[in-house]
Design a protein with these regions (language model features):
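Glycine-rich flexible loops
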Residues: 1-360
Length: 360
């Protein structure tokens, strides 16, 4: 490999026993583990993934009842507080496993009635996935190492090769009742199972403690990273051909100083000022310098999780430092952004549901 011998980096185990010892309650324990998972973006993008813990809680009349706390909608693992978990009455949730099917609307309405605290956040669409896995702690993440395999065309075979009988594979299905039941059934039917991989989605692991579930996530992701790196070791990235030569550091800085304001102005034309972040990493420049770059960037997102943070396709702006001047580049940026905006508006109009609204 031309840039980095590791296509996917192993994930460090950041468990802090001293900090964990301060987490006395079940809720504090799952919160501590959530912060560790969310602080590593190789495990979960902003807002992605969710965690849960089962235990007992006091209901509104003072009774101790079996409960499950699940990360609620709208929070991020890295920064969430205990108030971002939704506590539910477990005995009113578990019977749903025996149903053959359930609509999203019925599921959401049922879970709302199961909440121990009506003021808690709305239940995650993946609440039942956590409830149906018979373990005290369940961690669901979207790790780079796992999705590098799970998003591959032959991902199922690769997962079997990497993990053997330790893993179950679930074909892609939108989060909701059906996915939760498939995951729950896989775990219940095989007590020796250690992980479930969701195609084009992510990873589910579990344990008797927050630490066990967290460290299993780390171990599984490290094993997947090693597998991917070995498989990719002798393969050239991006077809192995260079299309353009990167600018030197000084010239690159001068070029960015001149063109970034043009790009910022173009993407802020709707009246909403944008902030730009330039990724100058070797991995990024290897892609944009490659012959295959213009084609590969237009394939589409590898998994739905990416679409939460990006649009369907990126804008590719052609630029050859050896042949094009900055005036040409600036004009391509302006016209490219304008065309992209029109194309996206048409795409949205053709695919939007009745109540969908375009955010930007």
């Amino acid at each position: 490999m031309s840039v980095d011998t590791e296509l996917v980096h192993p994930v460090a185990d950041d468990w802090d026993e001293a900090a964990a010892a301060e987490a006395k309650s079940t809720l504090q324990q799952v919160l501590s583990a959530s912060h560790l998972l969310g602080s590593n973006r190789a495990l979960a993008n902003f807002g992605g993934g969710n965690t849960s813990a089962k235990g007992t809680a006091t209901d509104h009349v003072g009774r101790e009842v079996p409960a499950i706390w699940v990360k609620g909608s709208g929070s991020d693992l890295a920064t969430m507080s205990d108030r971002d978990f939704t506590p539910l009455k477990l005995e009113e949730v578990l019977p749903l496993f025996d149903l053959a099917e359930m609509s999203d609307e019925d599921m959401v309405a049922h879970l709302a009635r199961c909440q121990l605290d009506p003021a808690a956040p709305r239940s995650s669409i993946e609440t039942l996935l956590h409830a149906f896995v018979p373990a005290a702690h369940v961690h669901h993440t979207h790790p780079d190492a796992i999705n590098a395999i799970a998003c591959a065309e032959n991902g199922k075979a690769f997962i079997a090769e990497c993990f053997g009988d330790d893993a179950a594979w679930v074909e892609y299905i939108r989060p909701g009742f059906a996915l939760a039941k498939q995951v729950g059934a896989a775990v219940r039917e095989n007590p020796n199972l250690k992980l479930v991989v969701l195609a084009k989605h992510g990873l589910v692991v579990w344990g008797d403690s927050a630490r066990e579930a967290y460290e299993k996530t780390i171990a599984v992701c490290s094993q997947a990273a090693e597998f991917v790196n070995v498989k990719a070791a002798d393969r050239a990235r991006f077809d192995g051909a260079t299309g353009t030569v990167s600018l030197g550091e000084a010239e690159r800085g001068d070029t960015l100083t001149q063109v970034l304001p043009v790009l910022r102005g173009a993407v802020s034309a709707d009246g909403t000022s944008k902030i730009l972040i330039a990724d100058l990493s070797p991995a990024a420049t290897e892609l944009v310098d490659s012959v295959a770059g213009p084609t590969l960037t237009q394939v589409g997102a590898a998994c739905p999780d990416h679409l939460v943070h990006t649009k369907r396709l990126p804008l590719w702006v052609a630029f050859d430092p050896g042949a094009d001047d900055l005036g040409t580049l600036k004009q391509r940026i302006r016209s490219g952004v304008a065309t992209y905006r029109d194309d996206y508006a048409q795409y949205f109009a053709e695919n939007a549901s009745v109540n969908d609204q375009m955010a930007d």
